[in-house]
């Protein structure tokens, strides 16, 4: 919207979450009084209006730039929103500063490789030692090399893998999914390990399509991607309902099915693309451990045992703030599944329902006693698949 000179964005994304002005409107605390985001209706539908924020300066990075400022990104693992930022700042009369690894003669970069045209760039900084990642470069992330199936290390058999395996059962052949950061990021690796990675397509908000998502500090990259999209285009696809399933992680879950990932225990973690991804997906799979803080489990022989319980409740009566709205999900007809290492829950009109129990887990001692609210126990409570 900034590049196009539009006043803002009208979207269903964020309804009934912390960015909705009927809640906190995205305000961090009571110091901020003005409502930046507006709630409105159009043709009988609810929307939030996000005003355009004019940008004065941006710092972007490329790999190669020619002497006219035309830049390519062949060594970058994603294109993210580099072009969109440059356009927005330029059209606002601002300053676009581009860093690149090398400079070449004007016109020597193939036009199909150019991601940022020179007329958008005001200042070029050459850094011959710039690194692609924290620890250098990885040609598997850029797609220059293809990793063999057995070259990708499998996850150890622990609580994270238990969650990833169960979550994987929520995606079907031909589906398009998103994988978020956190405990959910192991799903792509498990899919490759199980030999089903080619049956569906996993995407990451930063742009990769297909392949196996990287984990930890390298999240946002993928190995063996089939395509690499600009991040704004990826989010257009998400916001428009293109995802069949979203795999995301949760920090807090409350009795109404709301999830908080952005602000808890006095810490501001931020949302990333969480709100967008949740808002448009047909199915939302939220992954996490039942408790946090020193939780230790033992996995083996088809069972899981709690060796040391976590110090902190994650299933609480009411979320401090709402990043994902259970109410809105039910309004939109989304299927919502919450997967932990010891149980699976689903969101219904009646509330959060316990539907599956892991082998080796006691429902009273290991589930209900460890939650801040009592879930509805399904009359068809079944065992989690081993």
Residue spans of the language-model regions?
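N-terminal active-site beta-alpha-beta segment that forms phosphate/nucleotide-binding
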Residues: 1, 145-226
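Conserved phosphate- and dinucleotide-binding cores of soluble alpha/beta proteins
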Residues: 1-148, 216-386
